[in-house]
Amino acid sequence: MSDMMTCMPFGQLMDWVLQEKKGQDTVFGVHRPYTADPKNDMTIFTRNLETPVGPAAGPHTQLAQNIIASYYAGARFFELKTVQKMDGAELSACVNKPCILADDEGYNCEWSTELTVPDAMGEYIKAWFILHVIAKEFGLGAQDGFQFNISVGYDLAGIKGDKVNTFIDGMMEAKDTVIFQECRKWLLDNADKFQNFTREDIEAIPSNVCNSATISTLHGCPPQEIESIANYLLTEKHLNTFVKCNPTLLGYDFARKTMDEMGYDYMVFGDFHFRDDLQYEDAVPMLTRLMKLSEGLGLEFGVKITNTFPVDVTRNELPSEEMYMSGKALFPLSISLAAKLSAEFAGKLRISYSGGADYYNIDKIVGCGIWPVTMATTLLKTGGYQRFTQVADKVEGICPKKWERIDVDALKKLAADAITDGHHVKNIKPVPNRKSTKEVPLLDCFYAPCSEGCPIHQDIPQYVALTGEGKYKEALEVILEKNALPFITGTLCAHNCMTKCTRNFYEESVNIRGTKLTAAEHGYEQLIGEIKAGEPNGKKVAVIGGGPAGIAAAYFLAREGAAVTIFEKEEKAGGVIRYVIPGFRIGDDAIDKDISFIQKMGVEIRTNTEITSVADLKAQGYDAVILAIGAGKPGTLKLEKGETVNALKFLRDFKANDGKLNIGKNVVVIGGGNTAMDTARAAKRTEGVEHVYLVYRRTKRYMPAAEDELLEVLEEGVEFKELLSPVSLDGGRLLCKKMKLGQMDASGRAGVTETADVVEVPADTVIVAVGEKIDTDFYTANQIAVDERGKAKVNDKTLETSVSGVYVAGDGARGAATIVEGIRDAQLAVKDILGKEITRDAAVTGDVKDCFEKKGILKHSKEAKTEEERCLTCNKVCENCVDVCPNRANISIKVPGMAMNQVIHVDYMCNECGNCKSFCPYASAPYKDKFTLFANEKDMADSKNDGFVVLDKENKTCKVRFVGQITDCKADDPADKLYDGLKKLICAVIDDYGYLITK
């Protein structure tokens, strides 16, 4: 496929807007319009402005449809994508693709517009007309309630050249341009298509599109050049002017220190740009002169803060050597520069702001007197343009009618607070891979990432919704269908579902684990009386081990009518959860409630009973035996000198003795997993202990433990000793070799190398939490084949061992695993024993419209009454790729005969920025992998995408590429061999979405 975009004719754009609004009540995929209240209007550059927010010069202001979508959602100030003398194919060839990565902080390697400069002007003027139309036609606001601001660069010679100069003049006065006349004529010729927009309104559309400019210069541009451009725009063009400043004005030391403190120490940047860019001591007098000049001319002048921040590509983020950082990591730098300049000029220097602005800081920025504010990175995330609606709502009434000055003290506080603000600080752990291992299908690609990420594929959106509605019993029924341990998993689950949750791209995951526990706690008494075993099926099964996997196996067996006996060597069932996991993490009551489900179904639990022979059980008439014996062989770490304590033994002793152990004042825990975190927290609570040190050979960022576990350990005062490798214990001191982080491996984890430096850590006791192993003696004693690592050889789909009718589940199958993985193992074994499916999916209910009401709305758990308010119900609607595409090149369409909307990719609108790949939950890139509509056969030939080009709309003849084969197709012919679902999709495009087809 080509990364060259094709501009749509004005008539096609206008038809698209009107027909989509009429048919779907959306505009370019934006569902909820923002309607401006005139009482909140303000004035800038002598013109009216309804909201002080809009899209920054970048991907969201390149094409007309981007600007229209922004306006519909609530934007009113449009900083148009930069134009310069290099443009079109020449510029596009210099931009490596994909060029955007925005799954956390943002990065890009793009420049100015990839259109030709004349085409860019055409897009802006088409958008100018359409905004005037929809403001009146759809009742969104005043026709003069928005403003366009041109962004020009990169040097004075280029700006004075015919290409850019013609652009500037055309945007200042467009009445004689061909595109202005075309747009005006189309509206007059089609005036009967409008209900509210009149011929008089058409005649009144002003031709002076903009009266302001933002100067964008390349890094290293001399101050004299910047000032000469500003002088030219002010004196020759009489444009209100902003000069874009770079974060490099803060100096290298400030930027490096700030990024390191905030967790962005992995960002690599040198001091070159800080030395080469505009220097602060040059900037202040230059800005002083320009302020005086503009005042004398009766124009407004200010700075645009800030440009993006150049960093090196070191982890294959983008196909470039250098990229530009934006978003949450840029905010503390940009707002600090704003504070510095504002203090310098006593609040009299006007600032147009961009640099990590989003819903959570927009009111504070505007409240300081900084506006307009433009955005990019937040719009690149799920919710997309719809995020503007919440942003516009939040700033209503904050701005004065006319700008006065900046509140310097408030701005200083905002800058100081940004350094520790959780919305901008980097998480301790690296951003996890949130993608599935599956490739996106051409049709029906919606699915819930949480359910997919759960080893037992729980129906999470369904029980979250039921819990939110207060239907706790029904929610617990949904949970118990697939999860036998709602109390235990509601407390301790490793919650991969939450890692995969799309809500992470908004602010934080839906609290799925907590919701499960809420449903269990509130639904238990209503449901426990109804729990009973299934009709007897004649099967008799023994389960060895009463831990999570064993309890789960017994639950599913008994529910389906099998007679089940659990053999547990301890005094009570519960396994590691009861005897090892500390009581401050889970109480016995929660464990007992989960066990009560199997007790209600008549499962026999024989405690204090250790089984050594599987053959003996079979001789007693058991049809099958499930081994859920755990992985209890201690992991070891041999020191050159001194003894260590195994973590599981310590935790067992801690729990058995209520923390009354003699382990000294200084305790070292070696390890970085969840068991190490439990051990450190328990040691902190042990009688007589004063200091607990957690020693790990890498840094916190690379510890296997979950982030929430790490945070709890930090909050409780455990001292982290990073980059240390233990050597020996002698005289109350643990000697460690200092380690050094090396290159990243393919998984993104840093390697480590040993240095000659030695570090001492006070240590009366050293506890080792470095992984438990499977005790293979039981397997070999029972003639069960094991592999070279001592694990039982099993059928991966059934977990049956080499001994017929004997299965392995839980930690004893694969080594230390999660609780929910143990439940999955139990399901696999039970399914094979019974020869049938044992779980059923919950029904998907509710109105799809409710899903779209939540899109684009940022809301933390603490801000919501229930998690149902935040759950995006991805099992009904995903459309992440539709949300995040700046160009609207991924389209959701209704196909007759299909339950859910389908997504197609529109080739001629795409520039291969790659943003949709980051947010698609599949291991795919929608711009490459979704069924694609091409404008013509040439475009199709230039692409490898499966897709189609419409040859004749009337006869529905197309050329189609499917699984790489190109054929001619008549979409409405039942005899045509093309897959029926794709024929339906093509027919829907032709019949109901004809505006997508270019003429």
What is the predicted function of each stretch?
Residues 809-837:
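A conserved FAD-binding loop/helix module that cradles the flavin
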Residues 448-469, 490-520, 565, 572, ...:
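Iron-sulfur cluster-binding cysteine motifs and their immediate structural context
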Residues 76-86, 247, 364-391:
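Glycine-rich phosphate-binding active-site loops on the catalytic face of alpha/beta enzymes
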Residues 519-535, 593-613, 634-687, 787-797, ...:
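Glycine-rich dinucleotide-binding loop and its adjacent helix/turn
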Residues 89-108, 380-404:
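C-terminal helical cap(s) of enzyme catalytic domains, especially alpha/beta-barrels
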Residues 458-468, 476, 505, 509-513, ...:
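Beta1-alpha1 glycine-rich phosphate/pyrophosphate-binding loop at the start
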Residues 642-665, 744-816:
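FAD-site-proximal beta/loop scaffold in flavoenzymes
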Residues 22-38, 248-347, 382-400, 641-642:
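Glycine/Thr-rich beta-alpha phosphate-binding loop at enzyme active sites
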